[in-house]
A protein has these predicted regions:
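Extracellular repetitive beta-rich solenoid segments
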Residues: 1-61, 106, 122-124, 135, ...
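Terminal (often C-terminal
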Residues: 58-125, 134, 142-147, 180-200
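Exposed beta-sheet edge/beta-hairpin loop segments within beta-rich domains
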Residues: 101-103, 160-165
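Conserved aromatic beta-strand anchor motif in extracellular beta-sandwich/beta-rich domains
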Residues: 130-136
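Beta-sandwich interaction modules
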Residues: 112, 157-161
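Exposed beta-strand face motif in extracellular beta-rich ectodomains
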Residues: 168-170
Length: 200
C-alpha cells in the first residue's frame, strides 16, 4: 500500500495517554539494579514535567563514619573540638577538617551519633560532656554528661535526629572538669562520629 504518510511532529501537548501504547514501559528493558546517582527520571511537579537525578530522591546519603586514630589531649574546663582524622566512609566527600558540611541539595533530617572514651590516666571527674555542635553552637539536643571513674577509661555516647540545611556544619566537642589535661583513648571504636540522612 506504499509508505505511511508522514504528518510531521505533533504539536506540543497533543499526545495524550490514550495515544500511547500500553507496553510503553513494560515493553522496555527492566532496570534490575538500584539506579545510579546520575540516572534521570521524569515527573510532574504541580503539573509541569521535570527531569530529576535519582541522587536527589533517595534517602540514606549522605552518610559518613569518622574516628580518631591519634590520641588527643583535652584541657580542663573548656569545650574542645574533637579531632576526627580517619574515615571509614564518606559517601559525598562532605567531611573535612573535623567537620561534616551538608552538601547542596542534601538538606533534611540526619541521625548523628558520637562516642568519646577517656584513656586510663584520668582521675575521677563529675563532668565528661559529649556534645554535637551545629554551626558552632550546641543547640541540637545532642548533649550528654557522664561521670568518669578513676583509671577506668570509660566514656559517653550521644545520638540525635537533627534537621539540617545545606551548608550547615556538624562538629564533635568535649568538656570535662577533671582538673588537668588528659587524653582520649583513640581508635575506631572509641572516639568516633557517624551520620546518615534519613529523609527531607
Amino acid at each position: 500500500l506504499g509508505n505511511v504518510l508522514d504528518l510531521g511532529t505533533p504539536s506540543d501537548g497533543t499526545v495524550t495517554n490514550a495515544k500511547l501504547a500500553q507496553d510503553i514501559i513494560s515493553g522496555e528493558t527492566a532496570l534490575t539494579d538500584i539506579p545510579a546517582d546520575t540516572d534521570e527520571l521524569l515527573l510532574s511537579d504541580a503539573g509541569t514535567l521535570k527531569r530529576i537525578d535519582y541522587s536527589l530522591m533517595r534517602a540514606g546519603t549522605p552518610s559518613f563514619r569518622v574516628y580518631q586514630s591519634s590520641a588527643q589531649s583535652i584541657s580542663n574546663g573548656t569545650s574542645t573540638q574533637v579531632t576526627l582524622d580517619s574515615e571509614d566512609w564518606d559517601t559525598d566527600s562532605a567531611f573535612a577538617s573535623n567537620t561534616f558540611t551538608v552538601p547542596a541539595g542534601k538538606a533534611g533530617k540526619y541521625i548523628i551519633t558520637a562516642c568519646i572514651r577517656a584513656d586510663a590516666s584520668w582521675a575521677e571527674t563529675e563532668q565528661f560532656n559529649v556534645m554535637i555542635y551545629r554551626n558552632g553552637a550546641v543547640d541540637t539536643g545532642a548533649f550528654v554528661s557522664n561521670g568518669i571513674n578513676a583509671s577506668h577509661g570509660n566514656g559517653a555516647c550521644v545520638s540525635a535526629v537533627i534537621d539540617l540545611a545545606a551548608a550547615d556544619t556538624i562538629k564533635l566537642y568535649i568538656y570535662h572538669d577533671e582538673g588537668g589535661t588528659e587524653g582520649l583513648e583513640a581508635g575506631q571504636g572509641n572516639v568516633f562520629m557517624s551520620g546518615i540522612r534519613i529523609g527531607a
